[in-house]
Amino acid sequence: MAEERSLNGEATGQDDESFFDSDQQGDDGKSTELNQKIGDLESQNQELARDNDAINRKIESLTAEIEELRGAESKAKRKMGEMEREIDKSDEERKVLEAIASRASELETEVARLQHELITARTEGEEATAEAEKLRSEISQKGGGIEELEKEVAGLRTVKEENEKRMKELESKLGALEVKELDEKNKKFRAEEEMREKIDNKEKEVHDLKEKIKSLESDVAKGKTELQKWITEKMVVEDSLKDSEKKVVALESEIVELQKQLDDAEKMINGLKNVVEEPLNGIEFKSWSPNVTAVGSGGAVAAVAVAVAGAAVVCYIYHSRRV
């Protein structure tokens, strides 16, 4: 009878050990799978962080290039303003030349008027001389009124001398005006030549600057398009990164919960490990110390509790039969 009870007790102990071994293997598999999943998520998070850093560096580079293009555009605009001011200055010089040309025209008119007065004075002198000759002829013919005629002749001579003096003054003025007119024409010609050369140079510089501005504007437009493209890509990556971060946060919360459950299971298992073999009324209780490292869920913990309760019932029945 005692041998039968001993055999029944050994069979019951073997069944309990096989039950706990299968549960331990399931918990180890779940813990390994969970750790692998955590490692994969951490690797994905690091890869997304590296991609985000690369995109940020590219955006900074494009931003610096656009700022450089804006500086070149501003410099070109300042140069354009200087060229416009020089053109305005050239317009003022042109106005001066036009004033000189107007003055030269006035001088030409004055010269023509003086020439007309000179011709008129010569005509009057010739007429006075003819009149004097005529008077002399009349005096010689008539022989009377010689004194009066001589006075008239003297007066006419005075008029003639004054006219001749005036003619000399007019001729002197005319010569001076002609010299001045020639100088003015030479100055005007040289100034016009210089002005044409300056205007041609300025127009060439303005054309070159306009072409450069067009090129810069094209580069700026390309830079803006590229920047918009990178901004769009950045927004897409940032949205993906936000989704990944949300997934990581959710997984981290799940990991924390699983870790909490794992800690609770380990505490329960450690409590079971501390069961000491003590005889009670002649009955021997075997301590159970399974090699459990992780528990994956609350169901495993419940299974452990049920197994412990079953072992306690078996021990109680065995003790009752002996009594």
Curated annotation (Swiss-Prot):
It is found in: Mitochondrion outer membrane. Involved in morphogenesis and proliferation of mitochondria. Does not act redundantly with PMD1. Is not involved in peroxisomal proliferation. Homodimer. Interacts with PMD1. Plant cells silencing PMD2 show enlarged mitochondria. Residues 319-323 are mitochondrial intermembrane. Keywords: Coiled coil, Membrane, Mitochondrion, Mitochondrion outer membrane, Transmembrane, Transmembrane helix. Its main location: mitochondrion. One of its GO terms (biological process) is mitochondrion organization. Residues 13-26 have a biased composition (Acidic residues). The gene is PMD2. GO terms for cellular component: extracellular region; mitochondrial outer membrane; mitochondrion; plant-type vacuole. It comes from Arabidopsis thaliana (Mouse-ear cress). This is Peroxisomal and mitochondrial division factor 2. Residues 1-297 are cytoplasmic. It is a single-pass membrane protein. SUPFAM superfamilies: Tropomyosin. PANTHER family: CILIA AND FLAGELLA-ASSOCIATED PROTEIN 58-RELATED. The chain crosses the membrane at residues 298-318. Residues 28-278 form a coiled coil. Residues 1-55, 73-92, 120-143 are annotated as: Disordered.
